[in-house]
Swiss-Prot record:
Protein's UniProt name: Large ribosomal subunit protein bL34c
Lineage, opening ranks: Eukaryota, Rhodophyta, Bangiophyceae, Cyanidiales, Cyanidiaceae
GO biological process assignments: translation
Basic residues composition bias: residue spans: 10-19
UniProt organism field: Cyanidium caldarium
Keywords annotated in UniProt: Chloroplast, Plastid, Ribonucleoprotein, Ribosomal protein
Length: 45
């Protein structure tokens, strides 16, 4: 749900703001991946 709204806003905004929001989106994705990895490690333990 969150990713859909972010991509929708990116299309409406200008290239600069779109690039900036794109960077933020990648940061959020990295955090989500880290959370998933941590959960997997806890499950393994």
């Amino acid at each position: 749900m969150i990713q859909r709204t972010l991509t929708g806003t990116n299309r409406k905004k200008t290239k600069r703001s779109g690039f900036r929001s794109r960077m933020l989106q990648t940061e959020e994705e990295k955090l989500l991946i880290l959370d998933v990895m941590k959960k997997r490690y806890y499950l393994v333990k």
